[in-house]
UniProtKB/Swiss-Prot annotation:
EC top class named in words: ligase
Gene name of the record: murC
Keyword set includes Cell membrane: no
Native species: Syntrophotalea carbinolica (strain DSM 2380 / NBRC 103641 / GraBd1) (Pelobacter carbinolicus)
Annotated compartments: Cytoplasm
Cited PANTHER family: UDP-N-ACETYLMURAMATE--L-ALANINE LIGASE, UDP-N-ACETYLMURAMATE--L-ALANINE LIGASE-RELATED
Name listed for the protein in its UniProt record: UDP-N-acetylmuramate--L-alanine ligase
Chief location bin: cytoplasm
Reactions mediated catalytically: UDP-N-acetyl-alpha-D-muramate + L-alanine + ATP = UDP-N-acetyl-alpha-D-muramoyl-L-alanine + ADP + phosphate + H(+)
Amino acid sequence: MYGKIRTIHFVGIGGIGMSGIAEVLLNLGYRVSGSDLRVSEITQRLCDLGGMIAYGHAAENLGDADVVVTSTAVKSDNPEVIEAHRRLIPVIPRAEMLAELMRMKYGIAVAGTHGKTTTTSMVSTVLSKSGIDPTVVIGGRLDSIGSNAKLGQGKFLVAEADESDGSFLKLSPIIAVVTNVDADHLDYYSDLDEIKRTFVDFINKIPFYGVAILCLDDPNVQALIPQVGKRFVTYGMSTQADYNAQEISYQEERTTFTVCWQGERLGQLSIRMPGQHNVLNALAAVAVARELEIPFEQIAEAFCDFCGVQRRFQPKYQGRDIMVVDDYGHHPAEIKVTLAAACSGWNRRVVAVFQPHRYSRTQALFDEFVTAFYQADHLVVMDIYAAGETPIPGVEARLLAEGIAGHGHRDVHYCPDAEAVAAHLREVVQAGDLVLTLGAGNVWQIGEALAEWLQQRD
């Protein structure tokens, strides 16, 4: 960046997307300040790296900032945003700052409604283990680096591309991955067709020497292909895909399969993550690595060290006879594949605890939610996590639970809060169960509390 930019201020610096960019900038030598509503592990890490963080939002937090970065969650009436405008300090979205970092490197951007974080993490791990040493900005904590960001010395930057508000169009990667396209963020987009058009624009932003890596299993991605004007390769389960998986074996958290490229067997890959959706994520990472001419043997070896991402089918407790797992899945499509992974890898009764995320999403996807949980043997639905939204009349978790029961689920229960859920779980959980917490809010805390109780009990 131009030398006169010294201090960069982040409003909402504790967010998973914001904190990664802030960490990279700190490691590049910039002064980074920020604000957030509460102390967290993320804000503490940034403070340890030299960040200056205030808690609560106030005009005086800006200090001597040269530029202010905001996330999509920050509203225009935020006092720090108002103060920045008053002082004529540039206010830019998170994606614009990420685009500036990407401009200094060769960018690899992973987009899609689901699977972005895991796929980005897999790509980052393979490139790092192959000596490429990329800069990494991910929307989740990658266990192998202990963070969601890393400043590398190599010439590539691997980033998760957030489509939620269309701002990923600010990025200019040379490799663009699209895992899938689904109806989500309908508080911003008018409908699925608009989402698909935005993804076409994203893909076609790659330069003439770049490549798009597209999931052929997803019908909405298939529908984009005739409009793609740049070179692309595909991946999926079908032999019609350039990269495909054969001879898949699921054994608890370990999934093993053979990778094929246009009919040629490249070799076997083993990943420590369950489910067909993670096979697809791994195929995308293989495709990226092969574009960078990394030999398949090195790719397979790198996957041996991939130990997952925080809140993506993350084991919280493995006792004598009960297992507790947490997952970020909060969209009907994500819920279905996560439950399928739990069923395919383990011969256990699945007890799912779901916390709906946002009133707008619950309302827009209600019909999809009521049929998404059929693979859960026992289901608990708790109150909606607002994520800053104002409640919408008639949009209630209780009605969602009733809708799920009305569509044939024979064992669904509504428990409004964490206390009620904890009491219910202690009553119903039995030997052989896999307890799965699902949602993008704070439902993970219920899993941790249950794990602590089980540990004391055992």
